Amino acid sequence: MASELTNRRHEIEQPEAESYYPKPIKPWFVAIRPIRYMLREQRLVFVLVGIAIATLGFTIFSKSSNHQPIPYDVDPLSGYGMRSESSYLPATIHKKPSIEYMSRIGSAGGKIPLGLKRKVLRVVVTGGAGFVGSHLVDRLMARGDNVIVVDNFFTGRKENVMHHFNNPNFEMIRHDVVEPILLEVDQIYHLACPASPVHYKFNPVKTIKTNVVGTLNMLGLAKRVGARFLLTSTSEVYGDPLQHPQVETYWGNVNPIGVRSCYDEGKRTAETLTMDYHRGANVEVRIARIFNTYGPRMCIDDGRVVSNFVAQALRKEPLTVYGDGKQTRSFQFVSDLVEGLMRLMEGEHVGPFNLGNPGEFTMLELAKVVQETIDPNAKIEFRPNTEDDPHKRKPDITKAKELLGWEPKVALRQGLPLMVKDFRQRVFGDQKQDSSTTSSSTE
């Protein structure tokens, strides 16, 4: 009896466990309250209209991006970074870029939809402290890219790029391209090589090593990191041409054992390596064959004909014309060349492309233009011609016009005064300049 009472007491003291819920259960229709609120306040209409407008705008701007522009254009007589509608080029597809390369650069080469920023590229310029390289660096910096200059300063000058030293997007490395270098980049402009007879004849073995081993190293870098590679070759690959004007399909007439062969054959070999990497390793490559170029920042005593004539006229020395003065050359202003290089890099054609001004001058005519510009009383002095000096040189730029939409804009009489102004400042403003003038060449 007692045990029954005890058990009943325990039953009374321990009530049945009730179901426990941390939060009260809400009916299912509570989940649609936000939708009902949006409908009541008509906010859904505004959201849908906004999405429709954004989609329409993006579609319109995407359709207009079927062009491959150079984001900035140059007013060659006023400066860099000028925006121009003429810089937008129709993209004629020759070979589609690799998926790896396009994934790296994104839409950096085309028009950017409204509200989206252009992707900043990491670009290396070998020989970027030199004459042409420094002008190219100016354009790339104006475009907003991160630029790395690689130069051994054999012919380059720090003064050419000093104005970028405080820019966080600029980096300069003292390095010789005959030695390998590891960098993470999207594009490689390979300009490193002595380009004047005085410099490449000074050390011909070093010149051909720069052309061959240096190009090999830069192509290897492009292969490893998936960068696009642009080789600056030269009109010297045509040698003393038997075809005039020269087209890209002409194979040339080069002396392989002459005093200029270290440069001529070196560039021909560099083109071979570039195409072998393109065909064998699927490297994105571009090849430019550059004709005679002039402008500010040229070396004063580098032995090239324009710089020699200008320096001699400023120093009141006779203008030295070699041979009978009937040899012909074509001269392009440096801003025209830089524009062509950038269009080639951003385009979809491998090349090679002739980049030069088809306006042809004899050496005697050039000397007279320099006389008119600097000193009408300057004398002209004739001397024996140099070895292996080509008799004629004129580019056929039909291919560049059709596929790149490029042609030079600056005439010789327009660009020469800008070069004279720069030379005048350096010749008379720097007392350390050597007053002697090296022997001229029609390079």
Swiss-Prot record:
It is an enzyme of class 4 (lyase). Residues 65-443 are lumenal. It catalyses: UDP-alpha-D-glucuronate + H(+) = UDP-alpha-D-xylose + CO2. The active site is at Y263 (proton acceptor). Its main location: Golgi. Pathway: Nucleotide-sugar biosynthesis; UDP-alpha-D-xylose biosynthesis; UDP-alpha-D-xylose from UDP-alpha-D-glucuronate: step 1/1. Substrate binds at residues 260, 292, 305-309, 322-329, 389-393. Disulfide bonds: none annotated. One of its GO terms (molecular function) is NAD+ binding. Its cofactor is NAD(+). The modification N-acetylalanine is found at A2. The keyword Membrane applies. The keyword S-adenosyl-L-methionine does not apply. The chain crosses the membrane at residues 44-64. GO terms for biological process: D-xylose metabolic process; UDP-D-xylose biosynthetic process. NAD(+) binds at residues 151-176, 263-267, 304. Catalyzes the NAD-dependent decarboxylation of UDP-glucuronic acid to UDP-xylose. Necessary for the biosynthesis of the core tetrasaccharide in glycosaminoglycan biosynthesis. This is UDP-glucuronic acid decarboxylase 4. It comes from Arabidopsis thaliana (Mouse-ear cress). The lineage of its organism: Eukaryota, Viridiplantae, Streptophyta, Embryophyta, Tracheophyta. The gene is UXS4.
